[in-house]
Amino acid sequence: MNKPKNPLKNRILTILRLAVYDFKAKYAGSVFGFIWAGIEPIVTVIVYWFVYSVAANFSWSDDCHYYLWLSVGISAWLFISEGIKSMTSAFRDYAYLIKKTGFNKPSVLRIRAISCIFGHIIFLAIVLALCVYENTFSSAWIYLPLWSAAIFLFVYSVGRIFSLICAKFKDMQNIVGIGLNICFWITPVFWRLSQNASFPAGIIKYTPGAVFVNGYRSVLLYGTFDIKALIYIICIDALIFIIGSPMQKRMISDIADG
């Protein structure tokens, strides 16, 4: 006697399989494959470390080594930026699947969002190994999944809005790319923002990017957990998610025609 099928379980497994395929497709044909997910951010860290620590010879006063401080910040930032960029083009990248098979459109967003997690896990594993090597391990690490989940919700919520717009307005991809580049330079990823900074610089510490980057650093490097900052950013995530929900209901039916 055949066991009754579980539609929800089958859908979840399908989304997970397609998310894995989506991640592998990014590195299809390359010699090193998904290893590039770790190589690229490492090279980024080395370049910024060399430019600011060696070439520019700037002063750094912290018990934590600059390369490690930078690595943790970049791990959080790349999760945000790469995730949003990838989400923005989701409907266009999967247009063939939607048009030919009538694939569930909201699932496309979930596939792309989950796919972004894999690359983050690879680089984060390297960062955690460096943290252990530099002896920054503490009990506060148990809160890291909370910050990662908050970033994931932010990426999904923002990416959903951008992907809906991009499905009808292709230039949205370029706009998002430029916007993320600007946000990178004003977010304290490779530079330190004073906690006592006055207006307008003081506003930066309340931006999502700064909150996420500082949240990762506080947990992994300084053994502290700022519950107020996490609650604040979860409220921001929820607000963006709520804004995106009616947009999805209104716009998603026309996606296949884009």
Task: Cite the ranges covered by each PLM segment.
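Hydrophobic transmembrane alpha-helices and immediately adjacent juxtamembrane helices
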Residues: 1-258
